[in-house]
Amino acid sequence: TLNTQHSTLNTQHSTLNTQHSTLNTPNGIVRMLNAHRIAFIASPRVGNTTAMKTNQVEAEIIAATVMQIFSSTADSFDEAQTIGIIVPYRNQIATIRNAIDAAYRTMFGNADSKQNEAQRNKLHNITIDTVERYQGSQRDYIIYGFTVRHPYQLRFLTNNTFEEDGMRIDRKLNVAMTRARLHLIMVGNPEVLQQDETFSRLINFAKQRDRKSVV
């Protein structure tokens, strides 16, 4: 299990990492996860669109992460045990599923075979849900997509917090952390997230720990 204190994200056996560039290298995500039990992948800020509760860029990052985990786990991949995805908005669920379908076609093509159908079914059966509705048990990998693109959306994202030992703790992030058996992967835009105290501490910890800038 993750050795993590909820209030401070003190990770004696874990490290936060902020490398968007790993997505552009072969097996970069897998190498990142081999070194880090908790990872934060910085996504670029998305411009204005009509769909305020979706984030296509984050969906594509999550899909790339899913496909690299899927490839690295090979025959041991279990849709009920390996990956769970948590997002704040239901609209983002379909966006992520479509991105996973597109990433699958890019990786494996459109060949119609029993093997391909079985692989697609495994990916379609991955649990993707909101924090409020997520009823899944623990997964080896939990991917938490923040989705938000504007500061005002942080009010919804952080509307459920509690105090413990004088620290404000975000319940939604806490749920994601408690569902991660081996790895917690967070995807979000640091420029927006840093405007919240809790998320700012998380990202600053990542910078100080790895001496890297958030991109």
Feature annotation, model-predicted:
Residues T1-Q12, Q19, P88-R90, T178-R179, ...:
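Conserved coupling/interface region of RecA-like P-loop/ASCE motor cores
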Residues T8, T18, T22, K212-V215:
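Conserved small/polar residues in nucleotide/adenosyl-binding loops
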Residues A35-H36, L123, Q138-Y141, A180-H183:
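Short glycine-/polar-rich loops that comprise or flank the Walker A/P-loop
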Residues A59-A63, I93, I128, G166-M177:
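Amphipathic alpha-helical transducer elements in NTP-driven molecular machines
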Residues P151-V215:
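Helicase C-terminal subdomain and adjacent C-terminal extension
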